Each structure stands twice: as structure tokens, then as C-alpha cells.
Amino acid sequence: SRGISRYITKKNRHNTPSRLELRKFCPFCCKHMIHAEIKK
């Protein structure tokens, strides 16, 4: 895949302390992929 596809979402850290995973369309892969939250 060329580059990294990123999605910006707002999340409540109190409700979801674990890593957020979203099934979104990846423009680099041209298909739906699971976009996990990037560890900070």
C-alpha cells in the first residue's frame, strides 16, 4: 500500500480505554480495511 490512510474521530477515553477500531474505506488499498487507533 502507498502511504497510510488516517481517519480522525473523537472518542470518549472514559468509555473506550482500549484501542478504537473502525472499518473504513482505505483510498490506498481501494477497499474497506480496519483502521486501528494509533498508539501515542
Curated annotation (Swiss-Prot):
Entry-linked InterPro entries: Ribosomal_bL33 (IPR001705), Ribosomal_bL33_CS (IPR018264), Ribosomal_bL33_sf (IPR038584), Ribosomal_zn-bd (IPR011332)
Cellular component annotations (GO), alphabetically ordered: chloroplast; ribonucleoprotein complex; ribosome
Protein's cellular compartments: Plastid, Chloroplast
A single BP term in Gene Ontology: translation
One GO MF term attached to the UniProt entry: structural constituent of ribosome
Pfam families the UniProt entry points to: Ribosomal_L33 (PF00471)
Domain of life: Eukaryota
Keywords: Chloroplast, Plastid, Ribonucleoprotein, Ribosomal protein
The family this protein is said to belong to: Belongs to the bacterial ribosomal protein bL33 family.
Name assigned to this protein: Large ribosomal subunit protein bL33c
Annotated source species: Pisum sativum
Name of the gene encoding the protein in the UniProt record: rpl33
